[in-house]
Amino acid sequence: MYQKLLLVPLLLTSALASPHDASSHQKFHQLNERAAFPIPASKGSQTFKEPYYVKGTYDGGMKTFGRGVKCTGQKEGGDKDAVFIVADGGILRNAIIGADQIEGVHCEGSCTIENVWWQEVCEDALTFKGTGTGVHKVIGGGAQGADDKVIQHNSGGSAIIQDFTVQNFGKLYRSCGNCKKQFKRTVQISGVKASNGKTLVGINPNLGDSATIDGCASSVKEICVEYEGTDNNGKEPKKAHSGPSNTCKFKEPLASC
């Protein structure tokens, strides 16, 4: 009887301790993941009252740039909400986009986004706009905390994404699924480091889209998803396929990061 009485408190102590220990371990793991995001140290900050328009080349000197506003989640914004608007042929490099913004960076046509980092993505990090068939390059840099898309491709042409780091995200790249004016789009991704995401790439093969993907991915549910794109802006595109195909080109599985 004495042994049984001793055993009960010990079991109760163990039962009470286990959830706490698991929770602490989970929080510690989450903090470690956040700390691992390799965003460079900021060399200052600047808040814009309106979008900064980039013609030619703009080097941000690794400062943090924002708009001094709170993120509005997945509520659709516009050009007026961007931190930078990059003109056709423009180059934006060496910048950190702060959390105090809504729309991040917009490209009006062909552009190069080099070594640009997003502290926390709001609606989208980077949007390719316009009506042309240009080349959109993303070289280095990274983003985290996107509830949905990191890179939204609305215009036509190609996207080249090299050595980009993305963590805790919905989609790294999405070819617009229901834009009123649709285009054929291609995306080439190499050297990507992706972790804790839902979908790496989403394309619309019925509109001529294709994707080539190489890099590493950890805890990413789907690497490449094919949709039936539409020009009906009020309709969500249907998911058609997930995995390697003639239009989703990658070796399954991708290496773990």
From Swiss-Prot:
Enzyme category, top tier: lyase
GO molecular function: pectate lyase activity
Keywords assigned by UniProt, alphabetized: Calcium, Carbohydrate metabolism, Cell wall biogenesis/degradation, Lyase, Polysaccharide degradation, Secreted, Signal
Main location as per UniProt: secreted
Places the protein is found: Secreted
UniProt remark on cofactor binding: Binds 1 Ca(2+) ion per subunit.
GO biological process assignments: cell wall organization; pectin catabolic process
Enzyme Commission number, as recorded: 4.2.2.2
Cofactors required: Ca(2+)
Signal peptide start-end: 1-17
Family (UniProt): Belongs to the polysaccharide lyase 3 family.
The protein's name: Probable pectate lyase E
Organism for this UniProt entry: Aspergillus oryzae (strain ATCC 42149 / RIB 40) (Yellow koji mold)
Lineage: Eukaryota, Fungi, Dikarya, Ascomycota, Pezizomycotina
